[in-house]
């Protein structure tokens, strides 16, 4: 990988943020406040082992406190303030999820909703098989980060390393949010790269796979059946 430092361009180009193509949207409920302290979240953060199917409320709490938009810059609408930090306030990573109840979707931070994505079935199968190698028989949500290379390149020369650093910050933030809400979260060591980058049909930007993770309830269907 090229490890040269990124250089901010003296004058950004004309590129405007592009959204992923969606077939339909499902609104999420309003996020609720976490009941634990920041210290407690830090102390309880561990890589998850069991992943039950997350509820809409759990998804809302997690996604709303990771990617929700707080503010959009008036002079440059590519720059946004969200819960998580990002290079130059660009937030180039799109957070995709595979949910058993919906299939592949993307979190839409402006409307706090999930957008159903058109995907290539063979690519989907390969990505899910890759995740199953890490966590066989899980019931959780697969998280995939697809970063917009063109957006970052509009502002920085040699922007590729920045995309991975940015995704790392997002994943670390997500791990703490999951801990605060009592959810299981595990960052996976692989991203699926070319397979993940070809997952979505009709994508309008250069997509770079920058992260793969699992999110779920700590109560699996197996444990629920014993109650």
Question: How does the language model describe each region?
Answer:
Residues 171:
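C-terminal substrate/ligand-recognition segments
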Residues 1-167, 181-227:
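N-terminal accessory segments that position/regulate proteins before the catalytic core
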């Amino acid at each position: 990988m090229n490890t040269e430092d990124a250089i901010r361009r003296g004058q950004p180009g004309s590129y405007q943020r592009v959204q992923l193509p969606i077939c339909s949207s499902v609104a999420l409920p309003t996020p609720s406040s976490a009941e634990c302290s920041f210290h407690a979240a830090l102390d309880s953060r561990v890589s998850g082992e069991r992943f039950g199917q997350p509820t809409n409320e759990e998804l809302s709490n997690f996604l709303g406190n990771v990617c929700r938009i707080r503010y959009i810059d008036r002079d440059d609408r590519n720059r946004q303030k969200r819960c998580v930090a990002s290079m130059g306030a660009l937030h180039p990573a799109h957070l995709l999820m595979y949910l058993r109840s919906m299939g592949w979707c993307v979190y839409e931070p402006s409307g706090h909703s999930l957008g159903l994505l058109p995907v290539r079935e063979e690519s989907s199968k390969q990505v899910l098989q890759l995740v199953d190698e890490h966590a066989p028989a899980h019931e959780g949500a697969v998280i995939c980060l697809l970063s917009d290379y063109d957006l970052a390149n509009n502002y920085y020369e040699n922007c590729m390393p920045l995309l991975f650093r940015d995704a790392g910050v997002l994943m670390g933030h997500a791990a703490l949010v999951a801990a605060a809400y009592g959810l299981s979260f595990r960052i996976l060591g692989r991203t699926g790269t070319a397979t993940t980058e070809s997952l979505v049909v009709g994508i309008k930007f250069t997509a770079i796979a920058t992260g793969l993770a699992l999110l779920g309830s700590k109560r699996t269907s197996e444990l629920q059946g014993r109650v």
